[in-house]
Amino acid sequence: MCFRKSIVFFMLIATAILLSGCGKDKAQDEAGKKEPLPHRKVIIDTDTGADDSSAIILAAKTENVEILGVTVLVGNVDLDQSADNALMALEIAGSDAGVYKGAAVNASGETIEAFSVFGTDGMGDAGLINPKREAETQDAVDFILETVAKYPGEVEIIAIGPATNIAKAIERDPETMKKTKMIWSMGTTGLGPGNASPVAEFNVYADPVAYKEMLDSGINVTIIGLDMCSGDAQWTGEQFETLSNTNETGRFVARSFEKLREFYAGNGSESVMNCDSLAMTCVLYPDFVKSTLQCHGSCITDDGETKAEVIFYQKGFTYDTVENDFDYNVTLVGEVDKAKYFSMYLDAIR
């Protein structure tokens, strides 16, 4: 009997060890699993140059993202070219989202383009643009307002160009626009220097009046500034070669940056910023953002040396007083995981 009891005892011990091991493995497996990203309804508002195009492709290749439409405007290129570039990016990414034309000039009736940076077609002048589809007949502003009204509190507008279309939508129907879940803006210098002037970033400089309207609208705005796109976030020549050798999508993106790379090389830099795809990464992958700041953002619209500068009054600083009574109208991205940016983009388009 003692022998049998011993056998039973050891069998129970062995079973318990096995079960505890299985439980541990299961717990480790569960811990290793990431929660699926939530479904996102987005409108991409863009002046489609090479970096905008790469951002559209990133969004279209991200499974949990529903692109409700792409609204285009003048900026890097003229309005018609912006539409064709967006259509081509969607085609390359396998998306049938509609493209809607908006502003052909900024709020002051001017056009500020970037042919010298991105090429005359905005896509490196590499012969890439021959879309099979055409833009929709509905106006971009009408589309924005109709879509926000259809999905109140759900639509996120990802603004990777000047704010002209958004400002026009706010002017036309401010109450509907307040039902926007979030406007994500690739714009401003953040807390660093500018690229259109020492104090201004191109998207804001192209239409500071519209940018001010957006900031003052009462809509939730999160800003990804130019300062997030520098340093380790810049794409190197070696990384462009890797991108080109990945697949057809990667080759398209790499070729579209040829003029921009020439522009940077002329200024002594082998690596380039891809600001719009970095902004899109912030939007789509929350873990990429390491810190944010609550701020009051104020845009200068007057002509002069400070035109289009956006000043950020950060919450908790000495000027944060009862007398100032700031409306903290923006969330400013303060830090991102720059070193992971390129690999995250590469994984998304594979």
Identify the role of each PLM range.
Residues 1-9:
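Bacterial N-terminal signal peptides that target proteins for export
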Residues 18-21:
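C-terminal motif of bacterial Sec signal peptides marking the signal peptidase cleavage site
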Residues 23-25:
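Bacterial signal peptide processing site
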Residues 29-40, 58-67, 205, 209, ...:
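Conformational coupling and interaction surfaces
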Residues 35-46, 50-88, 127-230:
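Active-site histidine-anchored catalytic micro-motif
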Residues 89, 93-100:
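A glycine-rich helix N-cap at a beta->alpha junction
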Residues 99, 214, 280:
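A residue-level signal for conserved active-site and pocket-lining positions in enzyme catalytic cores
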Residues 100-131:
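Surface-exposed loop and adjacent secondary-structure segments within mature catalytic domains
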